[in-house]
Every structure is written in structure tokens, then in C-alpha cells.
């Protein structure tokens, strides 16, 4: 399953804190680099999202928790859609 993990830094969070925490968690082996399918920052900084693929939602919790003092998370499971198949289905349903 693919998960969107959107983050927004707390107002007092600094770039040094975030970079330090990322390095700390990388050294601890908890950043799930093999399961990350994308890492995107929003223009302007302080927010972005990661795409993580795992069947275990507990892995998402374990990934996000060490960052919760620095940022808020909005985590959602994603359902893939194939455009042409969706349009065909919509035409039948409408």
C-alpha cells in the first residue's frame, strides 16, 4: 500500500533541527529509505510530503513519531487510479 505522509513544520522549527533529526534517524535505520517512493518539499519550505510503500501501517507510525516534536503529520493511504479505466467506469455509473 502507498501512503502519503504530508508534513508541516511547527512555527519554531528550524532547518538545522530538521536536518539533524533526519541524519539521526538515518543513523538509527528508521527512515525507511528502501520503502520511500518519493520525497517532495513544497516551494517556500517548511512543508512537503513523502510517499512510502508498506503493507504495515505500524511502520508509518514508527517512521513519523520521532519527528512529531518538530512537525505535524497528515498521513493517508492512497488508492491508485488508472485514468482511462476510471473514465470508462464513470460513464457507466453516470
Where are each of the predicted segments found?
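Conserved, structured core segments of small domains
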Residues: 1-94
Amino acid at each position: 500500500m502507498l501512503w502519503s505522509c504530508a508534513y508541516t513544520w511547527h512555527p519554531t522549527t528550524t532547518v538545522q533541527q530538521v536536518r539533524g533529526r533526519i541524519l539521526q534517524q538515518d543513523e538509527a535505520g528508521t527512515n525507511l529509505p528502501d520503502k520511500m517512493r518519493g520525497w517532495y518539499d513544497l516551494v517556500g519550505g517548511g512543508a512537503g510530503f513523502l510517499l512510502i510503500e508498506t503493507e504495515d501501517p505500524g511502520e508509518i507510525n514508527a517512521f513519523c513519531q520521532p519527528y512529531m516534536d518538530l512537525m505535524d503529520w497528515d498521513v493517508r493511504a492512497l488508492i491508485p487510479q488508472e485514468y482511462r479505466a476510471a473514465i470508462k467506469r464513470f460513464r457507466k455509473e453516470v
